[in-house]
Amino acid sequence: MRKVGLRIDVDTWRGTQQGVPHLLEILSLHGIQATFFVSVGPDNMGRHLWRLVKPQFLWKILRSKAASLYGWDILLAGTAWPGRQIGAGNADIISAAADHHEVGLHAWDHFAWQTWAGVWDNAHLEKHIRLGLDSLSQIIEQPVTCSAVAGWRADQRVVKAKESFGFRYNSDCRGTTPFRPVLADGSTGTVQIPVTLPTWDEVIGEGVSRENYNRFILDRIKQDTGTPVYTIHAEVEGIVMRKHFSELLEMAAQEGITFCPLSELLPDDLSTLPLGKVVRGAIPGREGWLGCQQLIDH
């Protein structure tokens, strides 16, 4: 059996309200547990519309048919009106997810983090983490043990900012295998579990269609030479593409692929993990910079 970490990002009000319940039902049907990373503050995702002036982002919107995929309520959220508080308005749903799955912090304000985290100082980074952490721990009535920044917008500054919160692990970057990030003083920080596989919106329309996506991603899992981690989004696989996602899980089981929460990918002895850093980089299909794993050779 090939073990794959299944990460579910929840970015918006609609993704929480509609997508998460669908995904909980699908996962229960297939007997699978996953890790949900949830956004709990204001839903301002519609403010990303200004990025349409950037050719790469515009092409992504066009090839993924974003309006039909996400819905106009997501694409316009927080533009003409204040963004709704996701956690406060959907606490029962988030709590239900935590009853059966690992739940970690994604963001307080997903839009703000994705847009400004690259220039915020440490105090501002810590403020947003604290806001999200306090809200989420109150909702699920237990400590939050893991986190994953919005849009993989992370570097060594973000790694440092998270150190005081005592997470068991973070999943802030793209890469190949879990590692221990080296801090500026030479010590090692909280373990990172990178995402290794592409997401739906990164590849659809780039030679990959809705019809052959499941086959594409299963083949990529089999080709993965590291520790495979796959990310889906409640706004996509939990709503419009939920039938496709259920079919993916069925196909995976038939082909000897099993999914698990990210924490189950960690070894008992974390000191056996390689050392590395989170550096800014780029990947095909995603506009702008994002955190990438850089392993340190001994």
Curated annotation (Swiss-Prot):
Top-level EC class as recorded in UniProt: hydrolase
Known EC number: 3.5.1.n3
Entry-linked InterPro entries: ArnD, Glyco_hydro/deAcase_b/a-brl, NODB_dom, Polysacc_deacetylase_ArnD
Known pathway: Glycolipid biosynthesis; 4-amino-4-deoxy-alpha-L-arabinose undecaprenyl phosphate biosynthesis; 4-amino-4-deoxy-alpha-L-arabinose undecaprenyl phosphate from UDP-4-deoxy-4-formamido-beta-L-arabinose and undecaprenyl phosphate: step 2/2; Bacterial outer membrane biogenesis; lipopolysaccharide biosynthesis
Annotated keywords: Antibiotic resistance, Hydrolase, Lipid A biosynthesis, Lipid biosynthesis, Lipid metabolism, Lipopolysaccharide biosynthesis
Cellular component, GO annotation: membrane
Domain spans labelled NodB homology: 2-260
Stored HAMAP family: ArnD
Name this protein carries in UniProt: Probable 4-deoxy-4-formamido-L-arabinose-phosphoundecaprenol deformylase ArnD
Species name: Enterobacter sp. (strain 638)
Name of the gene this protein is made from: arnD
